[in-house]
């Protein structure tokens, strides 16, 4: 009996109609059967948010040989939970988020709905990868990333990933990629994050904006440096946020507390 093709579950935070997810599906189709469960509209910046105040529902968008596409009224994480719990008839071999319009390097990983997809897959014990491009334009050119996406996804299908570990892969916006660089997450922060917009009724409103400040400009081992220098940044990311290096010291402090 012929073995089943690998099942790859795909989602994003830019919405089911975004070019990035369409291109991702195109790149992944040679590797297996693709099921898309993506938000019905953009959900950028939603992180691992869940919908808990009202029901969500999903709808079939397209079905053809090797590809099924659904849209969902929930968040990216809702999409993965719903697909795994109520839609798919078998466990995916791989979960892929993206391709995000805009990078998810450095601290952006904490805010990203695309990485929320990946983190949820990781928590479910499924190898998971997030792909992002440093270009926010709706018509961004994803073509240079295609061969890298196929090879990285095929590698993880074959090799797997350690428990509670996923991959955060970011592409610089250039047709001349220099290759891949395995990186650590850059340390930095966003500054000047809000623009105040006055209104005639004296009630100001605010647009989220800002710029990223890298605190380690000379660190050639972080993802921000790799992207600035034309490399595909691959960052192994863990969902275990325990500060193991501080446990013993904190335990010492706590032993001195009196209750």
UniProtKB/Swiss-Prot annotation:
The reply on keyword Glycoprotein is no
Asked if Transmembrane helix is a keyword of the record, the answer is no
Pfam families with a match to the protein in the record: SurE
Catalytic activity reported: a ribonucleoside 5'-phosphate + H2O = a ribonucleoside + phosphate
Q: In the record's cofactor note, how is the cofactor described as bound?
A: Binds 1 divalent metal cation per subunit.
The protein's GO terms of the molecular function aspect are: 3'-nucleotidase activity; 5'-nucleotidase activity; exopolyphosphatase activity; metal ion binding; nucleotide binding
UniProt-annotated binding residues for a divalent metal cation: 13-14, 44, 100
Domain of life here? Bacteria
Q: Which cofactor does it need?
A: a divalent metal cation
Checking SUPFAM superfamilies in the record gives: SurE-like
Q: Name one GO cellular component term.
A: cytoplasm
State the similarity comment: Belongs to the SurE nucleotidase family.
Q: What does this protein do?
A: Nucleotidase that shows phosphatase activity on nucleoside 5'-monophosphates.
Protein name, please?
A: 5'-nucleotidase SurE
Which organism is the protein's source? Answer: Bacteroides thetaiotaomicron (strain ATCC 29148 / DSM 2079 / JCM 5827 / CCUG 10774 / NCTC 10582 / VPI-5482 / E50)
